[in-house]
From Swiss-Prot:
Catalyzes the conversion of glucosamine-6-phosphate to glucosamine-1-phosphate. GO terms for cellular component: cytosol. Keywords: Isomerase, Magnesium, Metal-binding, Phosphoprotein. It catalyses: alpha-D-glucosamine 1-phosphate = D-glucosamine 6-phosphate. It comes from Clostridium perfringens (strain SM101 / Type A). This is Phosphoglucosamine mutase. PROSITE patterns: PGM_PMM (PS00710).
Length: 448
């Protein structure tokens, strides 16, 4: 069997790739591996608003109960709520059923350990090994030793209280627009901002099981950008389906992506003496403009591979407090152990409130270098072609020479989809747009 786990848990089209049988096996193996030797272990289970969540939850919970563990079901809550509540409730593990920003037909299963961190590759491999062994030596308890399913009704309330407590200030006087992507933030974000005193205006907060991420949320912020201006809001926030990421919109309707949010928060925290080692952790996909802004503000940058797990690894290894990605995955390690869209939105809103500056003013700390991202569709087994094909390698070198130190070419395979992402930065938008499309077309042609 090829590796089950991708960069963010197990993902696939629900009911064909990610089947109820696989969910049961993951629940059974995951509960066994993560709770070995624990007396009556407790595992949290939550989901986003996808229609397939009910089916997968039933199967996953059955697997957990089959090894004698308790399943504490939280219902629909954001992914970061699982990370936080696993710690807060003293659970042995947490599981989120979500495919994040992916379309509705996809779903995923992601595990957290007892500290609220995503699993290491070694633990994921051990879960897969147990499944492939046919559950060799895994107990099948009977009678009173079986696990029970418990519905935890206070989960959403507990998460909202935690998120609100991260800012310690009223947001009264702020007009805030929220795009909930018809996903897991549709209650948590709305209630948190309202309870903090903000006047809120909400779109895409009516999930029906099939409309999650559909032309809305952080992957499609255009509607929010217009809505913020129309409603004369001070700012807006767009979440993805499971609310582990967040993008902002300023009062003029401009998008404020993860790079801007990171730079704004890093500058503010540094001024308060709360940015550990004056260092911000980012990935290779962050805009060169962020690097320049940080240099001007005397903020160090630590650069990792793409993926919030690599950002987190660097933060934990060096004790850094802030890191994230352009996509809006922002980790405030003083608050949570994973990217948290609601916590991110609240930090930005509180900075606007405390400084008295508009979000448009705050984002002027950074100037974006034009950046183009083009997806090349490639089979999963050919994702490394850009490192192996001589013509593609030569074309990349030619483009790098043409950019002459004022830009860059970055190519990376997607961890969750049959895509290779081609990213170019440079001073001339039209030029890099053409170069990126040419390179993506070349990669696709070589694969077909």
């Amino acid at each position: 069997m090829s590796r089950l786990f991708g960069t963010d848990g197990v993902r696939g089209i629900a009911n064909t790739e990610l089947t109820a049988e696989l969910a049961y096996n993951l629940g059974r193996a995951g509960a066994y591996v993560l709770t070995e030797g624990t007396h009556k272990p407790k595992i949290l289970v939550a989901k986003d608003t996808r229609i397939s969540g009910d089916m997968l939850e039933a199967a996953l919970v059955a697997g957990i109960l089959s090894v004698g563990a308790e399943a504490l079901c939280l219902g629909v809550v954001p992914t970061p709520a699982v990370a936080h509540l696993t710690r807060a409730y003293g659970a042995d593990a947490g599981v989120m059923i979500s495919a994040s920003h992916n379309p509705v037909e996809y779903n995923g299963i992601k595990f957290f350990d007892d500290k609220g961190y995503k699993l290491s590759d070694d633990l994921e491999d051990e879960i897969q090994r147990v499944i492939e062994s046919g559950f060799e030596n895994v107990p099948s308890p009977t009678g009173a030793n079986l696990g029970r399913e418990i519905i935890e009704k206070a989960a959403l309330e507990d998460y909202i209280s935690f998120a609100k407590d991260t800012i310690g200030i009223s947001l009264e006087g702020l007009r805030v627009a929220l795009d909930c992507a018809n996903g897991a933030s549709h209650e948590a974000a709305v209630r948190a901002f309202r309870e903090l005193g903000a006047e809120i205006f909400v779109i895409n907060d009516n999930p029906d099981g099939t409309n999650i991420n559909e032309n809305c949320g952080s992957t499609h912020p255009e509607e929010l950008m217009e809505y913020v201006v129309k409603k004369k809001c001070h700012m807006g926030f767009a979440f993805d389906g499971d609310a582990d990421r967040c993008l902002a919109v300023d009062e003029q309707g401009n998008l404020v992506d993860g790079d801007f949010i990171l730079t704004i928060c890093a500058k503010y925290l540094k001024e308060l003496g709360r940015l550990k080692d004056d260092t911000l952790v980012v990935t290779v996909m962050s805009n060169l403009g962020l690097m320049i802004a940080c240099k001007n503000e005397k903020i160090n940058t630590a650069v990792t591979k793409v993926g919030d797990r690599y950002v987190l690894e660097e933060m934990l290894a060096k004790g850094y407090s802030l890191g994230g990605e352009q996509s809006g995955h922002i980790i405030f390690l003083d608050h949570n152990s994973t990217g948290d869209g609601l916590v991110t939105a609240l930090q930005v809103a509180s900075i606007v409130k405390r400084t008295g500056k508009s979000l448009f003013e705050l984002k002027n700390v950074m100037k974006v270098l034009p950046q183009v991202l083009v997806n090349a569709k490639v089979p999963n087994n050919m994702k490394n072609i850009y490192e192996e094909d001589e013509e593609i390698i030569a074309e990349i070198k030619k483009m790098e020479a043409a950019l002459d130190g004022c830009g860059r070419v970055l190519i990376r395979p997607s961890g969750t989809e049959p895509l290779v992402r081609v990213m170019l930065e440079g001073e001339n938008q039209a030029e890099i747009d053409e170069m990126a499309h040419n390179l993506a077309n070349m990669i696709e042609a070589k694969c077909n």
